């Protein structure tokens, strides 16, 4: 197992360049999917390796419930600096699990409150809340709905309203809430993945912007709607529920919409900075997966041999 058990804990650093460059050089749809996949793989691998270290660390504690053979020198020799690393991993894994559980619970609570706020309103794909505060967001579920306040609608013209609805429907169609939830939990599992969470928050909004521009047939109208909504909007309901103007740097989104639409299937050459960043992130995720698999299989074999029959 050796040092391979530590690699997945730091390999998320290999994804930092792609988090910076993908949002600028790739189509938002491609960037969102790529970054979400990389973040998910790296988070799972780093958490798995923490768990392996916890097993070794727990076996050294007096009175632990694990088999006595698991504290043998052969087991401890599988992990460099086993005494320090094993015991440090115990509070680290506990913090990861608590943080992810807290994030998932908050997401579920926001979803429940959002659904409860629609009680008594007519069923349909669009729900208009009689609230003077301007906001709009996509609420996924068994029956996907676009939720918008009366205050938001009052501040937009007819064409801008169409852009708003197209944007939110794009969030629902693309299941962007799943991407946001994955990167949000991944960043809680490993703080080195926070740049990917920030990048996906932006690229998911850009993805919806581009789909909305196609739906309404005017990039300028969508840009104008985003700008006006941003000036009116309050804080987002939740970081894992896509909102029209709250997520992502609005000036950058508007500037992107004022340029020609990005190529849908464009992929950077491996000899460009963006291409190297993509391949670097892919290599990091692959090495992380192989390292965690190698560590898990090796430790399993060692523990099996050390377990009395």
Task: Give residue ranges: language-model regions.
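Hydrophobic transmembrane alpha-helical segments in integral membrane proteins
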Residues: 1-11
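Membrane-interface helix-boundary signature
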Residues: 2, 28-32, 79-85, 267, ...
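Polar-ligand-bearing catalytic/cofactor-coordination segments
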Residues: 14, 18-31, 85, 89, ...
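Juxtamembrane extracytosolic/periplasmic "stalk" immediately C-terminal to the first targeting helix
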Residues: 30, 63-70, 115-120, 298-305
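C-terminal region of N-terminal signal peptides and the immediate post-cleavage residues
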Residues: 49-62, 102-109, 283-307
């Amino acid at each position: 197992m050796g040092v391979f058990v530590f690699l997945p804990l730091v390999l998320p650093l290999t994804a930092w360049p792609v988090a910076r460059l993908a949002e600028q050089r790739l189509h938002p749809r491609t960037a969102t999917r790529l970054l979400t996949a990389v973040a998910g793989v790296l988070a799972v691998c780093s958490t798995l390796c923490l768990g392996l270290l916890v097993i070794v660390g727990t076996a050294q504690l007096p009175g632990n419930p694990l088999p006595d053979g698991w504290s043998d020198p052969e087991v401890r020799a599988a992990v460099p600096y086993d005494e320090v690393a094993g015991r440090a991993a115990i509070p680290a894994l506990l913090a990861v699990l608590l943080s992810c559980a807290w994030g998932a619970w908050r997401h579920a609570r926001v979803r429940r409150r959002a659904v409860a706020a629609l009680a008594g309103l007519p069923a349909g794909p669009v729900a208009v809340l009689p609230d003077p505060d301007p906001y709009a967001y996509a609420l996924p579920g068994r029956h996907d709905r676009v939720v918008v306040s009366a205050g938001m609608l009052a501040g937009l013209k007819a064409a801008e309203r169409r852009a708003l609805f197209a944007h939110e429907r794009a969030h629902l169609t693309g299941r962007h809430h799943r991407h946001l939830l994955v990167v949000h939990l991944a960043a809680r599992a490993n703080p080195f993945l926070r740049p990917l969470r920030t990048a996906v928050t932006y690229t998911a909004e850009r993805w919806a912007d581009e789909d909305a521009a196609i739906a309404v047939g005017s990039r300028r109208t969508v840009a104008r709607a985003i700008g006006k909504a941003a000036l009116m909007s309050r804080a987002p309901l939740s970081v894992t529920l896509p909102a029209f103007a709250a997520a992502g740097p609005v000036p950058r989104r508007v500037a992107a919409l004022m340029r020609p639409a990005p190529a849908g299937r464009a992929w950077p050459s491996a000899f460009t900075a963006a291409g190297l960043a993509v391949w670097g992130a892919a290599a990091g995720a692959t090495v992380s997966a192989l390292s965690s698999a190698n560590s898990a299989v090796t430790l399993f074999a060692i523990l099996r041999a050390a377990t009395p029959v």
